[in-house]
């Protein structure tokens, strides 16, 4: 049976299209963003452990792009102030690939499931399950990246040396410096997750990720996944003992949790809890 196209049908379609365009142009409210965050959290908490593990591993490997790009740029450009600025422009590459590719990143999960826990007062064990699987698999993914970079002929020796030097510099900070800088790093990346949840476009999301992750790199703020590849590269390159990795990792993880949960999730929940 042929479909009749009438002026009324076209009018309705035009009105619907105009409404959708208007919604896309409007800035989402905090409540709308929180609803999207909660929706994302429910989806992640329901995923099978194997799916989370593979996604977390992929996220760790992909995050190696950040260390790879900065190490190559540093080897080619040197360590002057201008060279450092240019090198840092490449720092967000790993974050862009992981977040837009929807791989699991531990610091994003300081926002999504915690927001749902605060809202519904449940999902505690599911959140701990998600955290443990993703963190372990993120770290295993960064180890795989480090092994590929250091233990094969994939990279020129000067790039491997640059990667190991960066990792050594990261790991040799004091515990207090690692912890407090990780709070800022966790705050910024959880804020990225919040803002991307309210973005209507891929290009807008990419710009948000790039701008905020650039600040993380420029300020040398600790990130438990982004910097793991460099630190593990230094370990595999025999510049650091294995114990140095774990000495660096625990304050970085703790600081990222405090920054993500305390400075983003709790505050964003607080502004929407009574509405």
Segment roles from a protein language model:
Residues 2-275:
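Alpha-helical transmembrane segments and their helix-helix packing motifs
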């Amino acid at each position: 049976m042929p479909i009749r196209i009438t002026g009324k049908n076209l009018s309705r379609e035009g009105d619907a299209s105009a409404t959708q365009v208007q919604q896309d142009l409007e800035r989402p409210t905090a409540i709308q963003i929180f609803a999207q965050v909660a929706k994302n959290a429910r989806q992640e908490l329901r995923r099978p452990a194997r799916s989370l593990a593979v996604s977390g591993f992929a996220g760790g490997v992909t995050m190696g792009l950040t260390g790879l790009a900065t190490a190559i740029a540093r080897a080619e450009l040197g360590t002057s102030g201008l060279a450092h600025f240019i090198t840092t422009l490449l720092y967000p590459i790993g974050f862009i690939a992981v977040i837009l590719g929807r791989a699991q990143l531990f610091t994003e999960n300081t926002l999504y499931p915690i927001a749902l826990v605060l809202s519904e007062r449940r999902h505690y064990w599911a959140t701990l399950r998600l955290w443990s699987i993703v963190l372990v698999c993120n770290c295993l993914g960064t180890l795989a990246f480090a092994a590929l970079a250091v233990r094969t002929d994939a990279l020129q020796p000067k790039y491997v040396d640059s990667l190991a030097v960066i990792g050594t510099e990261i790991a040799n900070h004091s515990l207090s410096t690692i912890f407090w800088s990780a709070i800022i790093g966790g705050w910024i990346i959880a804020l990225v997750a919040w803002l991307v949840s309210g973005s209507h476009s891929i290009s807008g999301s990419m710009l948000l990720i790039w701008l905020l992750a650039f600040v993380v790199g420029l300020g040398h703020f600790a990130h438990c996944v982004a910097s793991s590849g460099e630190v593990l590269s230094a370990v595999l390159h025999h510049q650091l003992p294995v114990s140095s990795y774990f000495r660096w990792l625990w304050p970085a993880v703790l600081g990222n949790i405090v920054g993500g949960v305390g400075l983003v999730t709790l505050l964003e929940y607080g502004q929407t809890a009574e509405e």
